Amino acid sequence: MLSHLRPAITMTVLFTGLCGLAYPLAITGVAQAVLPAQANGSIVTKGDAVVGSALIGQAFTSPRYFASRPSATSNSPYNPLASGGTNLGATSQKLKDQIAAAVTAWQANGRSGPVPADAVTSSASGLDPDISPENARQQVALVAKARNMPEKDVAALVEAQVQPRLLGVIGEPRVNVLRLNMALDAAGATQ
């Protein structure tokens, strides 16, 4: 009996050590050596203070800042512990009501024209840190007015923060909202 169990126990211990300890430690070591900022969560700092992560969206509610995508996380917006989509299907009346309310709120802030989809829908994770360049461009007038800055200066900040497609073909152009708002604060401090 023991002769039958010994190989199973040996393999269990071996693969637990290999897959549960050796491999994660090796990958962590390589990541820390090659890409330390990314391995540590792409933390964004202002001076010595941590202000967020470039990979996780934040709620910016003041008109002085560009707004992030809506968050789908339950209970509290942008809660990384509750990451996930809404699971509402395209035919869901609740989803249609949420989008209609978001469109109304978007237009109530003085914005006109077509509403970018990412301005009224959440991402699959509910934590997307980026918005489309069009979404950012449509917020320029509101942010410029709230900050008493020339629209052309705010628009230039948006264009400077547009990140192109990866390798020219993967994904869509995007704007990281946290980095844009930090650039906005820095520009406002110099005026």
UniProtKB/Swiss-Prot annotation:
Domain of life of the organism encoding this protein: Bacteria
Membrane topology term: Single-pass membrane protein
Location in the cell: Cell inner membrane
Major place of residence: membrane
TM region positions: 13-35
An annotated GO cellular component: plasma membrane
InterPro entries: KdpC
Region described as Disordered: spans on this chain: 112-132
Keywords (A to Z) from UniProt: ATP-binding, Cell inner membrane, Cell membrane, Ion transport, Membrane, Nucleotide-binding, Potassium, Potassium transport, Transmembrane, Transmembrane helix, Transport
Molecular-function annotations in GO: ATP binding; P-type potassium transmembrane transporter activity
NCBIfam families: kdpC, PRK00315.1
Function: Part of the high-affinity ATP-driven potassium transport (or Kdp) system, which catalyzes the hydrolysis of ATP coupled with the electrogenic transport of potassium into the cytoplasm. This subunit acts as a catalytic chaperone that increases the ATP-binding affinity of the ATP-hydrolyzing subunit KdpB by the formation of a transient KdpB/KdpC/ATP ternary complex.
Database matches in HAMAP family: KdpC (MF_00276)
Family, similarity comment: Belongs to the KdpC family.
PANTHER family: POTASSIUM-TRANSPORTING ATPASE C CHAIN, POTASSIUM-TRANSPORTING ATPASE KDPC SUBUNIT
Record note on quaternary structure: The system is composed of three essential subunits: KdpA, KdpB and KdpC.
Name this protein carries in UniProt: Potassium-transporting ATPase KdpC subunit
Organism: Allorhizobium ampelinum (strain ATCC BAA-846 / DSM 112012 / S4) (Agrobacterium vitis (strain S4))
Gene this chain is encoded by: kdpC
